[in-house]
Design a protein with these regions (language model features):
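Short catalytic-loop micro-motif centered on adjacent basic/acidic residues
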Residues: 544-547, 602
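Lectin-like carbohydrate-binding module/patch detector with strong preference for beta-trefoil
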Residues: 30-178
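Sec/Tat signal peptide C-region and signal peptidase I cleavage site
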Residues: 25-29
Length: 717
């Protein structure tokens, strides 16, 4: 931007700073709000229109604390500031040595080595002489930035200043994760623009972007974003997992890693990685942005929690003397996660130059999704995957009014997809008997409901499960994969808990018929009368019903209702349906019935071979069912990153590669770490483009290109 006002002579000494104002060419912005938003990622110098002086950095009175003042009379000595949005309308100002213009008391400004609340400034614009000047108020003090000067005997203050944009090379770039892509458009997402119909691209039907709140917020480290940047979003995880990861109870229990180097940005010594995806985020927003450029059109983000596991976290925190988790109440957790997602949307908008300009867009209807996708952006649907979604476990009071109230609350939040049950039975219906953790889930079901799973022999077309039957001799070292890596305090707590659990379990069961429990067990609980009201309520609100994690009997009953009402809004988002057996071609097979209704199926992603193993056997039957009804056949992916599971392992891969949308991808760089799919696999969500390319190549070479085509039709279907 060119300066719109002539410099004036310095009339007095600068005593303090409190408001920033700048002038800009009016052609850059039509409104004052646009003028503010367009400051994102700019390099600027700040000049007083009254005196012509520039802000410089200098030593304070004692020569120790660095300060800023209008002390410069020429452009060459003026401090350069990089304007990094902290939120919509709020900015960090970082100088060339990565210090931040900050205020912790009225009329004082210092150079902070790292950002804090005093480094955040809310900027507003004022139209001046055909351009704009800007006023800045500190978020910490609530005071504006002023230049105080003397005019004769009169002390005056100036609170509107000119800003001159400088070449980006004159500023220190704010640290950030790289996309490492090349496109034909200045804005990479313009490459993804398409028509509102016949959308080409895929859906990830099962993600957990908000999982950092899981288990009270002390299980999964890292954040999708942070107001102060990537250094804070992906910092060392020892605050949650302890020194050497010794307090990472869930990771040590269900992961195959032992203690770990907790270092985050910029070195990322051990995480993110495919195995540490269990308890470390892979959803930093720039990684998700890179994934979008692979053809990811639609993303279902399931808020996720489990009150039993949160309670265990609470007990562990008490034993360790570490910070306690946030509220374990599911409604509270879902609200926090939904708030986080909308805050992320605003943050991405701020980075992109204003409201609605970011690639990440939360949608509530199919029409909204089509509009967002056509604009080259990622459509995001919010869902819930939790065991106590409606607070209707066997230990709680539950009735139709309670269900309706919760459903109304969730819908008003923006939630559009829900698992009616997850992991445990409820008064709504029965859960599928998950493997390989079915026995652990059985213990959780007892804690949550006061009883174990009821079982019955499975239908021949269903893959049954094996359940342990008492008495038990529980060994902590066998229950926890990395028991020996626990800290002494945590190991003692686990020993006490397991000993107590063993006494209870051996007193009250479970006891099963060996003929059923030895590999042919299905949950005997189906859809209850309360569940019928819930399903009809979801249909009335046009919400998506995710049938994964339901017992076979419950899923059949849900399909009966949907068929009777002609409702197509059913999904199986990651293949956890009917005991993971997708190979039945029977016309009454649940997934075939779901497909005939117009429902949608996504399969869990690992290697190409494992994906094919889930999809291929039933692919023809489901495709035929869709075609018979005139539906476009499409099978999405269900990555389930941060669903407490590992991600796709490394496989041979060649860089660079160019996808069908014309986007060229090189190895992804985050800080000092370069990620290579050949070495790292899908270490974080930003490596989804590599996974999809490996699918394309492998499926094409094996003669299964039709499956890849079905994947790329999945967003439309």
């Amino acid at each position: 931007w060119e300066l719109m006002m002539k410099n004036k002579m310095l009339l007095g000494r600068v005593c303090g700073l409190s408001v920033l104002v700048m002038t800009a060419n009016a052609s850059f912005a039509a409104t004052t709000q646009e003028a503010v938003d367009s400051l994102a990622q700019r390099c600027v110098v700040i000049q007083s229109p009254q005196s012509g002086a520039f802000i410089e950095r200098s030593k304070g009175l004692l020569g120790v604390v660095q300060r800023y003042g209008f002390d410069g009379n020429n452009l060459s000595s003026a401090e350069r500031f990089y304007l990094k949005p902290a939120a919509l309308g709020e900015f960090l100002l970082m100088d060339r040595v990565e210090s931040f213009l900050s205020s912790h008391a009225p009329s004082t400004t210092i150079a902070n080595n790292s950002p804090d609340k005093g480094s955040e400034w809310r900027i507003s614009a004022v139209a001046v002489n055909g351009g704009f000047q800007y006023r800045l108020v500190n978020s910490n003090t609530g005071k504006s930035l002023d230049r105080i000067y003397r005019n004769g005997l009169i002390i005056k203050s100036e609170s509107q200043f000119n800003l001159q944009q400088r070449p980006a090379s004159e500023c220190k770039a704010f640290p950030e994760v790289e996309l490492n892509v090349v496109t034909s458009s200045l804005n990479p997402h313009d490459t993804m623009r398409t028509s509102r119909s016949n959308i080409r691209g895929y859906v990830d039907g099962h993600t957990h972007m908000s999982a950092e709140e899981f288990g009270g917020g002390i299980t999964i480290s890292g954040h999708t974003f942070h107001r102060w940047g990537v250094k804070h979003a992906l910092k060392d995880c020892k605050d949650i997992h302890g020194e050497g990861g010794k307090h990472d109870l869930i990771g040590l229990a269900v992961g195959d890693y032992k203690s770990h180097n907790t270092t985050g940005w910029p070195s990322f010594s051990e995480w993110p990685s495919t195995k540490m995806a269990v308890t470390h985020t892979g959803y930093y927003y720039k990684w998700v942005e890179r994934a979008h450029l692979s053809g990811l059109r639609l993303m279902v983000v399931y808020t996720v929690d489990n009150e039993v596991m949160c309670t265990i976290n609470n007990a562990a925190a008490v034993a360790l003397g570490t910070p306690l988790p946030k509220s374990c109440d599911t409604l509270n957790s879902v609200q926090r996660q939904v708030n986080d997602l909308f805050a992320l949307q605003d943050y991405v908008d701020a980075q992109s130059g204003g409201l609605n300009k970011g690639f990440f867009r939360i949608v509530r209807t199919p029409a909204e999704a089509r509009t967002v996708i056509a604009d080259g952006k990622l459509a995001v649907v919010i869902g819930i995957e939790a065991s106590e979604t409606f607070n209707c476990s066997g230990r709680n009071f539950c009735d139709a009014n309670k269900l309706k109230s919760r459903l109304d609350t969730y819908h008003a939040m923006g939630v559009r997809s829900i698992f009616p049950v997850h992991k445990f039975d409820t008064q709504v219906g029965g859960a599928t008997l998950d493997t390989p953790s079915v026995d652990i889930m059985n213990m959780g079901n007892f804690i949550d409901n006061g009883q174990y799973f009821g079982v019955t022999a499975c239908d021949p077309s269903i893959q049954g499960n094996k359940l342990l039957s008492g008495p038990f001799d529980l060994d902590p070292a066998k229950l926890l994969k990395s028991y020996d890596e626990l800290s002494p305090v945590l190991k003692t707590a686990v020993n006490v808990a397991v000993t107590g659990a063993e006494a209870v379990i051996n007193t009250v069961g479970p006891r099963y018929d060996p003929a059923v429990a030895n590999g042919n067990a299905c949950n005997s609980k189906g859809l209850t009368s309360l569940g019928v009201q819930l399903i009809n309520g979801m249909i009335d609100r046009k919400m998506l019903i995710d049938v994964d994690h339901q017992s076979t009997l419950m899923t059949k009953a849900v399909l009966d209702i949907a068929e009777a009402r002609g409702y197509s809004g059913l999904v199986a988002s990651h293949g956890d349906t009917d005991g993971n057996k997708m190979d039945s071609t029977e016309p009454n097979f649940n997934l075939v019935r779901l497909t005939k209704l117009g429902g949608h199926i996504s399969a869990l992603t690992r290697t190409t071979e494992s994906f094919k193993g889930l999809v291929t056997p039933g692919y023809k039957a489901m495709t035929r069912a869709a075609n018979e009804k005139g539906y476009l056949a499409g099978i999405g992916i269900g990555s389930d990153y941060n669903g407490l599971i590992k991600m796709a392992s490394p496989r041979p891969f060649t860089y660079p590669f160019t996808n069908e949308f014309g986007v060229r991808f090189d190895k992804q760089v985050s800080g000092n770490r370069t990620f290579d799919f050949s070495v790292d696999g899908m270490a974080h969500y930003g490596l989804l483009p590599e996974l999809m390319e490996s699918y394309r190549v492998s499926l094409t070479n094996s003669g299964d290109a039709a499956i890849y085509e079905s994947m790329m039709n999945s967003a439309e279907s």
